[in-house]
C-alpha cells in the first residue's frame, strides 16, 4: 500500500518559493548532499562499458544506469523499487537520479577555494587583513605564516620564508611558536578570528581615524565581517576540506562510433584531483619527507583550482589537444554559459521556421501558414481530435492516420486551427513588435505569408527573410496571444505612439498618384452628383484621376455617443472642389472622419497622420479596417498609375558645367595662395572641401528645381508652372523610395567622398550616375561603399550590446500600482534651440498626467485639473489658451518603491491609454532606445576649419513678432555711445507673444551689443544683438583710469605689429614660455578713481581687478581713462582646436554609462563671489567666497578657458570653466531634475539628428534606474555604514523602521551609476550574475549570504517562474494573498486550540509534507 501512495507522491507540484538564498556550504553540508565518496579516478570499464565501482561514474553512489535495474542484473522491474542490491550495492530506482545525486571527495589536505582568493578584491585577504600576495605565498608553500607566537616577539599572521622559519626555530627553540604552511595555516587563522570583537574594533577605529584611505579600507572590511556575522557563515568554509562531485549525467561520457569516447572536460579535471589526492594520502601514510608532501599538497591545490576556475591562476590546465579545459566556472559564465544559453534563452518545441512571402489578400490579423507546417505544429491537437471522434483508438493509430494525410486529417486541421492564433517572430527581435500573433490561414506551398502592413514593425522584407512560428498551447496562452499580441491590437509603436501599420513604397506611390491634381486634366471643371457618377465617368475615360472636379460628397459627423460609448452618425452632404482620384478614395473613409483629411496629395507623412487621426477619432477596429482598405486601394491604383523609370527622367541641370568650373577656379586660387605661403596646408584643404561641398549643394538645388516643376498650358491658354509628374520626382516626393540626396547622385553630381579613415578626399566626383563614372571616380566610390558595409557590421554588434545593457538595468521596473500620490513633477516647456522650436510643448506633454492645475493665462481660471491624463484634445486646448509651461508627473519623481505607478508614467504609447498595472515599462523603454540603435552612426564628427567657421554666428534676430524679455541672469551696462553691452555669461533673450507665452529664446554671449530693450515690442526679423564672432572681448564694468600691473613688455606681454595697418598691440605671453622668475606674474589691470584710489566692487572691500588671459590683445594703454562698457582686451577665438564631437551610438552609450568627459567643465560648488588667488605651477587658483565668508578653492589649468572674472557673483552649479558637462557634477550641484533634463536632451539630440522619434519618458525611466542607489552620508541610528551604497528603496524602508521606533533616520546623497554598474549593483544576485562578471557577483553574494527576492523579470525567468509582470503580476499577488490567508487560518486554529487547553494530537503525519521552502 505504501508503495502505491509513494507513486502518487511523485507527481507533486514543485514547491512554491518566494526567494533564493546563496551561501557557502560547510563541509558537513557537502557531505550531507553526497551519496558516497568517489575514491578512484576510473570512469567506466573499457570492456563491459559498465561504470567502475567507487569511480567517477559509480552506480552505487550515483544510481542505476537503466531504470529500475541494478548493475549486476539481480533485481529488475518496478516491483523491486527501493531495494539495494546486496551484490553490487546499487539502489533499484529511476536512472534520472544520476542527474541529481552528488558524490564527494575527502581531501587529504584542505585547499583554498580560488574564487575567494583570486576574485578581486580578495575576500580571504579582507577577512585576514593580509595582502593577496602573502596569502598566495602561504597557500602555494613558499612561506610560513605564524599562528601562535607564544612568548616570542613574533606577531600573529606574520609571514616568513623557510630560511627565516628555520632561523627563528633555532633562535627561540622548537615548539615555542606555531607556524604553518598551505591551506591548513590559513584555515587555522580563519578559525581563530573572533568576528564580534573585530567588528567592535573596526567601528572604534572608524570613529577615531580621519584619513580617507583608512576609512575606505575599514568600511570594506567591516562590510565583509558584518556579512559573515549576519549570515551565520563561518570564514573557514572558504577553505575546502570536502569537494562535492557533480552528478555524472551533468558531465557525461558519450561513446562515439569507432570505440572512442567523448567526455566532458570536468571528468579530466576531477580525475586529476582524485589522482593527486590519492597520491597525497599514500605519501602521508608512508610518512614521506616533508618536501615531497608539500609538493603534492601544492599540486592538489592547483588541481582543485583548475577544477573550480581553470586559468584564473597561472597557466590553464590543458587536455590532450592543448586546449584549455572547461572548468565549472566556465560552465556558467559568458554567452555560452548556463545563464545565457539555457536559462535566459531556451529552445522551444511546437515551433517551425520558413521563408516569408507577401500576402496581399490577407486581413491584418491573418498570416498564411503552409499546410505541412501546420500539420506538424498542431499534431497533438489533431491526435486528440481523432481520438475523441473515434477515428483512431490509440495515439499510435492516430499517428499513422496523420502520416497518411487522409482527407479527414485536413478537415480536422482546419477545425483545430480555427480561432487558434500562432505567434510569428523575426530575429532580431529588437522591440515587442518583433513577435506578434496572427490567425493562421492554411495555404499551399512552403512559405509563410505575411501581411504587408506589419513589415514595418518586424523590419521584414521579402528578399529571403525567414520567420519563426510558435504555437501557444494552453488556453490562457491562446487568450493572451489573442488579446495582447494579435497584430490588429498592436498598431502603434511603443517607442513614440506613432502608427506602425503605415503603408510604404508601392502603396504610397499609388495613393500619392491618385490624390495628386493636374492643371487642365481631361474633364476639368465637371460637377458630379455623387461618387458613383465619378466612377462611371472615370471608367468611361471621360475624366482622368488627377483632374480637378466638383463632387457632392457625403461625410458622417458624430452626433452623440450612446450608453455603450458607440457613436451615432449623421450624414452631411457638401459640394467639394477636389479631384477624381480623391473622391473615389473617399469611399473607404471611416465614418467620423471629414473628407478634408483626404483632400490633399497623400505623401507618406500624410498617410501616417491620416491613420493616426483615424485611430484617435474612430477607434482601433475602424482604423484596422481602414488601413487594410487603404492597402488594397494603394496596390490597385499603383498598377493603374503606370509609373516607371527611364534614363530621361534624370534631368541634368544645364547650370552644372558653370557651377563646377567656377568652383575649380576658386580652388586654383587657394592653391596659389598656399604656394605663396599665405595660408597653411590645413586651411587650404578645409577651404577646398568647403568650396566643393557648396558646389555640390548648388548643383543639387538646381537639379531639384528643374525636376520639381514643369510648364503646362491651362484652360485659358496661359502657360503656368505646376508640380512635376516626373516619375523619379514623384517617387521621392511621395516618400515611396529614394531621397533628394540619392536623386542628386543620379542627375546632379556625386560630390565629395570619404576615405576609409573618415577624412574627406578633396577632389570630388563631379560626374553623376547618368553620365557615368570614369575609372578613378569608380575607384574612389568603392571606398565609401565598402566602409559602409564594415560600419554596419560593427554598428549592429554595438547596438545589440547597448540594448542588452539597457534591458538589464531596467528589467525589474514594472508598473505596480495606479497612483503613488506624489505631488512632485517636472515643469515642461517647448524645446527651443537657437530660436527655433525643435519640439513643441504639446508633443512633450501628450500622454502625461498633470501634477498642478493648468491655468488659463487670460482668465486665471483652472482649465485642466490636477491628475488629468493629457490626451490629444486637451493638448489642443492648452495650445489654444496659450499656456507655455505645464507641470507633469514623471517616472523620476515617482514615490513607488520597487516599481513605478501608472500616473507617473502616463500613457502606454503602444495602446494609447493610461498604462496598465503590470506593464513592464522598463523593458519597453530599453527596447525603444535600443531598437533604432542600428540606424545611428558609429562615427565621431570632426569639426574644424572651414566647416565650423561657416557656422559661427555674429548676430541673432527674432523669428517671431512679440515682446522682448531678458532672463534674470542677463546683466548689461550702457557705454558712452548709449549702447547696451552684455556682461553676463549666461544671459538669454526671450520673445513672448501677447499672452506672455515664450515663443523663442536666444543665448546672448558676453560682450555682445544689445539692440533692443527689455519689454520692447518688436517685429519678426528684428536684430536683437550683434557681436564679433572671431574674438571674445573683456569689458570694463566700471569707470576709471587704468593702472597696469605685471604688464611688462618682453616679460609677460609682447608687442605685435600688424603688417597691413602698422599699428601695434600688446599680446599676453603664455606662462610656459616665460622665465622661471616671472612665471607666477599675472598681467592685470586695476582702475583708479578721481582721487587715485583703487575702485572697489560695490558692497565689498575687493578692488576691481581684471586679469588678462594668455593670448589676449590688450587694447587700452596704461593710465588711459576708460568708461563703463569699454573693451579692455580681446581674445581671438580663431585658435579653437578642431575637436572631435562624439556622435551617434557611442555618444548615447557614453551618456547612459554616465562617463565623466575628459576636460570636463568646472561648475561652481557654492553661490558666492569669484576672486583669483596665488597661482601655482601651470595652474591658476580660483576662489569662490560664499555668503557666509567661507572660501572654496579650485585649481584650474592655465590653458583652460575661465568664463568668470574677478568680483563676479556666480550661482551654485554655474559653469566657471568651459568644457563638456559632467553628469555627476550636474546631479551633485543642481539636482535630479536638471540631470534628467541634461541626459534626456543630449540623448534626444543624437536620435533627432537621425530622424528617430523616441518619447522622453523612456529615457527618464532609464535615468530613474541609474539613480536608484544612494550613498549614506549620516548613518543616524540605522544599520548602515557611512559611505555605503544602498538601494534607495532599502534606505527608505530602513528609515521608516527607525522613525517608527522614534530614532534618527539616515541621510543620503544621490548617486549616478552608469547602466553597466547599475545592473551589476542590483539587489538581485541572479540578475547581476547573468549579466556580466558572473564570478565576482556570485563570490560576493555567497559571502554575504544574500537572499534574492525574485522581484525582477530576469530572476524569475531564470528560476522558471511566471514573471511578475502583466498577468504574472496578478498571479503572484493572488498566490501571496492566498498564502497569507492560509497562514492566518493556521494561526487562528492553533490559537483556538491553545484557548481550549486541548493538547494538540501527537500524530502529525500529513502536516509536515510539502512545507519545504
Curated annotation (Swiss-Prot):
NCBIfam families: rpoC_TIGR. Pfam families: RNA_pol_Rpb1_1, RNA_pol_Rpb1_2, RNA_pol_Rpb1_3, RNA_pol_Rpb1_4, RNA_pol_Rpb1_5. This is DNA-directed RNA polymerase subunit beta'. SUPFAM superfamilies: beta and beta-prime subunits of DNA dependent RNA-polymerase. GO terms for cellular component: DNA-directed RNA polymerase complex. PANTHER family: DNA-DIRECTED RNA POLYMERASE, DNA-DIRECTED RNA POLYMERASE SUBUNIT BETA. Its cofactor is Mg(2+); Zn(2+). It comes from the Bacteria. The RNAP catalytic core consists of 2 alpha, 1 beta, 1 beta' and 1 omega subunit. When a sigma factor is associated with the core the holoenzyme is formed, which can initiate transcription. GO terms for biological process: DNA-templated transcription. Keywords: DNA-directed RNA polymerase, Magnesium, Metal-binding, Nucleotidyltransferase, Transcription, Transferase, Zinc. InterPro entries: DNA-dir_RpoC_beta_prime, DNA-dir_RpoC_beta_prime_bact, RNA_pol_asu, RNA_pol_N, RNA_pol_Rpb1_1, RNA_pol_Rpb1_3, RNA_pol_Rpb1_3_sf, RNA_pol_Rpb1_4. One of its GO terms (molecular function) is DNA-directed RNA polymerase activity. Signal peptide: none annotated. It catalyses: RNA(n) + a ribonucleoside 5'-triphosphate = RNA(n+1) + diphosphate. The keyword Magnesium applies. Zn(2+) 1 binds at residues 70, 72, 85, 88. Binds 1 Mg(2+) ion per subunit. The gene is rpoC. DNA-dependent RNA polymerase catalyzes the transcription of DNA into RNA using the four ribonucleoside triphosphates as substrates. Its EC number is 2.7.7.6. Zn(2+) 2 binds at residues 820, 894, 901, 904. CDD domains: RNAP_beta'_C, RNAP_beta'_N. Belongs to the RNA polymerase beta' chain family. Mg(2+) binds at residues 461, 463, 465.
Amino acid at each position: 500500500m505504501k508503495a502505491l501512495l509513494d507513486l502518487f507522491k511523485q507527481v507533486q507540484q514543485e514547491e512554491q518559493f518566494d526567494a533564493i538564498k546563496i551561501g557557502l556550504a560547510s563541509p558537513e553540508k557537502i557531505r550531507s548532499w553526497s551519496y558516497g565518496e568517489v575514491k578512484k579516478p576510473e570512469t567506466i570499464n573499457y570492456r563491459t562499458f559498465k561504470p567502475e565501482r567507487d569511480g567517477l561514474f559509480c552506480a552505487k553512489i550515483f544510481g542505476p544506469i537503466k531504470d529500475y535495474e541494478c548493475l549486476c542484473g539481480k533485481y529488475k522491474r518496478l516491483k523491486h523499487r527501493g531495494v539495494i542490491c546486496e551484490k553490487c550495492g546499487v539502489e533499484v530506482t529511476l536512472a534520472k537520479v544520476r542527474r541529481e545525486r552528488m558524490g564527494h571527495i575527502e581531501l587529504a589536505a584542505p585547499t583554498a577555494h580560488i574564487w575567494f582568493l583570486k576574485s578581486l578584491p580578495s575576500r580571504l585577504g579582507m577577512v585576514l587583513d593580509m595582502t593577496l600576495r602573502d596569502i598566495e605565498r602561504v597557500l602555494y608553500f613558499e612561506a610560513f605564516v605564524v599562528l601562535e607566537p607564544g612568548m616570542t616577539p613574533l606577531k600573529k599572521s606574520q609571514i616568513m620564508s623557510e630560511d627565516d622559519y628555520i632561523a627563528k626555530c633555532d633562535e627561540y627553540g622548537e615548539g615555542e611558536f606555531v607556524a604553518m604552511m598551505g591551506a591548513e595555516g590559513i584555515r587555522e587563522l580563519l578559525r581563530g578570528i573572533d568576528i564580534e570583537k573585530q567588528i567592535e574594533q573596526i567601528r572604534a577605529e572608524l570613529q577615531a581615524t580621519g584619513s580617507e584611505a583608512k576609512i575606505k579600507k575599514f568600511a570594506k572590511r567591516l562590510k565583509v565581517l558584518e556579512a559573515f556575522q549576519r549570515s551565520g557563515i563561518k570564514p573557514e568554509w572558504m577553505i575546502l576540506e570536502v569537494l562535492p562531485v557533480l552528478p555524472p549525467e551533468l558531465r557525461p561520457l558519450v561513446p562515439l562510433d569507432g570505440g572512442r569516447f567523448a567526455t566532458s572536460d570536468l571528468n579530466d579535471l576531477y580525475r586529476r584531483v582524485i589522482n593527486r589526492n590519492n597520491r597525497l594520502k599514500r605519501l602521508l601514510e608512508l610518512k614521506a619527507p616533508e618536501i615531497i608532501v608539500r609538493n603534492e599538497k601544492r599540486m592538489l591545490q592547483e588541481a582543485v583550482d583548475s577544477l573550480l576556475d581553470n586559468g584564473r591562476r597561472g597557466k590553464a590546465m590543458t587536455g590532450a589537444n592543448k586546449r584549455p579545459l572547461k572548468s565549472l566556472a566556465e560552465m556558467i559564465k559568458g554567452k555560452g554559459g548556463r545563464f545565457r544559453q539555457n536559462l535566459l534563452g531556451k529552445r522551444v518545441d511546437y515551433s517551425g521556421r520558413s521563408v516569408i512571402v507577401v500576402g496581399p489578400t490577407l486581413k491584418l490579423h491573418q498570416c498564411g501558414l503552409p499546410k505541412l507546417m501546420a500539420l506538424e505544429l498542431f499534431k497533438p491537437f489533431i491526435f486528440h481530435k481523432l481520438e475523441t471522434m473515434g477515428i483512431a483508438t490509440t495515439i499510435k493509430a492516430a499517428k499513422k492516420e496523420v502520416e497518411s494525410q487522409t482527407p479527414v486529417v485536413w478537415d480536422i486541421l482546419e477545425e483545430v486551427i480555427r480561432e487558434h492564433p500562432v505567434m510569428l517572430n523575426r530575429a532580431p527581435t529588437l522591440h515587442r513588435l518583433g513577435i506578434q500573433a496572427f490567425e493562421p490561414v492554411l495555404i499551399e506551398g512552403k512559405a509563410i505569408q505575411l501581411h504587408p502592413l506589419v513589415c514595418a514593425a518586424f523590419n521584414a522584407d521579402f528578399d529571403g527573410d525567414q520567420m519563426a512560428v510558435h504555437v501557444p498551447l494552453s488556453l490562457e496562452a491562446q487568450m493572451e496571444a489573442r488579446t495582447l499580441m494579435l497584430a490588429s491590437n498592436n498598431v502603434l509603436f511603443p517607442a513614440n505612439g506613432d502608427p506602425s501599420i503605415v503603408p510604404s513604397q508601392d502603396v504610397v506611390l499609388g495613393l500619392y498618384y491618385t490624390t495628386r491634381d493636374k492643371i487642365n486634366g481631361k474633364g476639368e471643371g465637371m460637377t458630379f452628383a455623387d461618387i458613383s457618377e465619378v466612377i462611371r465617368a472615370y471608367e468611361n475615360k471621360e475624366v482622368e484621376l488627377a483632374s480637378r472636379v466638383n463632387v457632392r460628397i457625403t461625410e458622417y459627423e458624430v452626433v452623440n455617443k450612446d450608453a455603450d460609448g458607440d457613436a451615432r452618425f449623421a450624414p452631411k452632404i457638401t459640394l467639394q472642389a477636389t479631384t477624381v482620384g480623391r473622391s473615389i478614395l473617399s469611399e473607404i473613409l471611416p465614418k467620423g472622419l471629414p473628407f478634408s483629411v483626404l483632400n490633399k496629395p497623400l505623401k507618406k507623412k500624410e498617410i501616417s497622420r491620416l491613420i493616426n487621426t483615424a485611430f484617435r477619432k474612430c477607434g482601433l477596429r475602424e482604423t484596422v479596417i481602414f488601413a487594410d482598405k487603404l492597402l488594397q486601394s494603394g496596390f490597385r491604383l499603383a498598377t493603374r498609375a503606370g509609373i516607371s523609370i527611364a534614363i530621361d527622367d534624370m534631368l541634368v541641370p544645364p547650370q552644372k558645367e558653370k557651377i563646377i568650373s567656377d568652383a575649380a577656379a576658386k580652388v586654383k586660387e587657394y592653391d596659389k595662395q598656399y604656394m605663396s605661403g599665405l595660408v597653411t596646408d590645413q586651411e587650404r584643404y578645409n577651404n577646398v572641401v568647403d568650396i566643393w561641398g557648396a558646389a555640390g549643394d548648388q548643383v543639387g538645388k538646381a537639379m531639384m528645381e528643374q525636376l520639381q516643376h514643369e510648364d503646362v498650358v491651362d484652360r485659358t491658354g496661359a502657360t503656368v508652372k505646376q508640380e512635376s509628374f516626373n516619375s523619379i520626382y514623384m517617387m521621392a516626393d511621395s516618400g515611396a523610395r529614394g531621397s533628394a540626396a540619392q536623386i542628386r547622385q543620379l542627375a546632379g553630381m556625386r560630390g565629395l567622398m570619404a576615405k576609409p579613415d573618415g577624412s574627406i578626399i578633396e577632389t570630388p566626383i563631379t560626374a553623376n550616375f547618368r553620365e557615368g563614372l570614369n575609372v578613378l571616380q569608380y575607384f574612389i566610390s568603392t571606398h565609401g561603399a565598402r566602409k559602409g558595409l564594415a560600419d554596419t557590421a560593427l554598428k549592429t554588434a554595438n547596438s545589440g550590446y547597448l540594448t542588452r545593457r539597457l534591458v538589464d538595468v531596467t528589467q525589474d521596473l514594472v508598473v505596480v500600482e495606479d497612483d503613488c500620490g506624489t505631488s512632485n513633477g517636472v515643469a515642461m516647456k517647448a524645446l527651443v534651440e537657437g530660436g527655433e522650436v525643435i519640439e513643441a510643448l504639446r508633443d512633450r506633454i501628450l500622454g502625461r498626467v498633470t501634477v498642478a492645475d493648468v491655468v488659463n493665462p487670460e482668465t486665471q481660471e483652472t482649465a485642466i485639473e490636477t491628475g488629468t491624463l493629457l490626451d490629444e484634445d486637451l493638448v489642443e486646448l492648452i495650445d489654444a489658451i496659450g499656456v507655455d509651461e505645464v507641470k507633469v508627473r514623471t517616472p523620476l519623481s515617482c514615490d513607488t518603491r520597487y516599481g513605478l505607478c501608472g500616473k507617473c508614467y502616463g500613457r502606454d504609447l503602444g495602446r494609447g491609454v493610461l498604462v496598465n498595472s503590470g506593464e513592464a515599462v522598463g523593458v519597453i523603454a530599453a527596447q525603444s532606445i535600443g531598437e533604432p540603435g542600428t540606424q545611428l552612426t558609429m562615427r565621431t564628427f570632426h569639426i574644424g576649419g572651414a566647416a565650423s567657421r561657416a557656422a559661427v554666428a555674429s548676430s541673432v534676430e527674432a523669428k517671431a513678432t512679440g515682446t522682448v524679455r531678458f532672463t534674470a541672469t542677463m546683466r548689461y551696462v550702457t557705454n558712452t555711445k548709449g549702447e547696451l553691452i552684455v556682461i553676463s555669461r549666461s544671459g538669454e533673450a526671450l520673445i513672448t507673444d501677447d499672452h506672455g507665452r515664450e515663443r523663442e529664446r536666444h543665448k546672448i554671449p558676453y560682450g555682445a551689443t544689445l539692440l533692443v530693450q527689455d519689454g520692447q515690442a518688436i517685429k519678426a526679423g528684428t536684430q536683437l544683438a550683434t557681436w564679433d564672432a572671431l574674438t571674445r572681448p573683456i569689458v570694463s564694468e566700471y569707470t576709471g583710469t587704468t593702472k597696469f600691473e605685471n604688464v611688462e613688455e618682453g616679460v609677460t606681454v609682447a608687442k605685435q605689429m600688424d603688417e597691413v595697418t602698422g599699428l601695434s598691440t600688446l599680446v599676453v605671453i603664455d606662462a610656459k614660455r616665460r622665465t622661471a622668475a616671472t612665471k607666477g606674474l599675472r598681467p592685470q589691470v586695476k582702475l583708479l578713481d578721481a582721487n587715485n584710489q583703487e575702485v572697489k566692487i560695490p558692497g565689498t572691500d575687493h578692488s576691481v581687478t581684471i586679469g588678462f588671459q594668455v593670448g589676449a590683445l590688450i587694447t587700452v594703454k596704461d593710465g588711459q581713462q576708460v568708461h563703463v562698457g569699454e573693451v579692455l582686451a580681446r581674445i581671438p577665438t580663431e585658435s579653437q582646436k578642431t575637436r572631435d564631437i562624439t556622435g551617434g551610438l557611442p555618444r548615447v552609450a557614453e551618456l547612459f554609462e554616465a562617463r565623466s568627459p575628459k576636460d570636463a567643465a568646472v561648475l561652481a560648488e557654492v553661490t558666492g563671489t569669484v576672486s583669483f588667488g596665488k597661482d601655482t605651477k601651470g595652474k591658476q587658483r580660483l576662489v569662490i567666497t560664499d555668503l557666509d565668508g567661507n572660501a572654496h578653492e579650485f585649481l584650474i589649468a592655465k590653458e583652460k578657458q575661465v568664463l568668470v572674472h574677478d568680483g563676479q557673483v556666480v550661482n551654485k552649479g554655474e559653469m566657471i570653466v568651459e568644457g563638456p558637462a559632467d553628469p555627476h557634477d550636474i546631479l551633485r550641484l543642481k539636482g535630479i531634475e536638471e540631470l534628467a533634463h541634461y541626459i534626456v536632451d543630449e540623448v534626444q539630440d543624437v536620435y533627432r539628428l537621425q530622424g528617430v522619434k523616441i518619447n522622453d519618458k523612456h529615457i527618464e525611466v532609464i535615468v530613474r534606474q541609474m539613480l536608484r542607489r544612494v550613498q549614506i552620508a549620516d548613518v543616524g541610528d540605522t544599520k548602515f555604514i557611512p559611505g555605503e551604497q544602498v538601494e534607495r528603496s532599502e534606505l527608505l524602508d530602513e528609515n521608516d523602521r527607525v522613525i517608527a521606533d522614534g530614532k534618527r533616520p539616515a541621510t543620503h546623497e544621490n548617486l549616478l551609476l552608469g547602466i553597466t554598474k547599475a545592473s551589476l549593483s542590483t539587489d538581485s544576485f541572479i540578475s547581476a550574475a547573468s549579466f556580466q562578471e558572473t564570478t565576482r557577483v556570485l563570490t560576493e553574494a555567497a559571502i554575504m549570504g544574500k537572499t534574492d527576492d525574485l522581484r525582477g523579470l530576469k530572476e524569475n525567468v531564470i528560476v522558471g517562474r511566471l514573471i511578475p509582470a502583466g498577468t504574472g503580476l496578478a498571479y503572484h499577488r493572488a498566490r501571496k494573498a492566498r498564502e497569507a490567508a492560509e497562514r492566518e487560518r493556521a494561526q487562528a486554529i492553533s490559537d483556538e486550540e491553545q484557548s481550549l487547553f486541548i493538547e494538540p494530537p501527537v500524530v502529525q503525519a500529513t502536516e509536515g509534507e510539502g512545507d519545504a521552502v
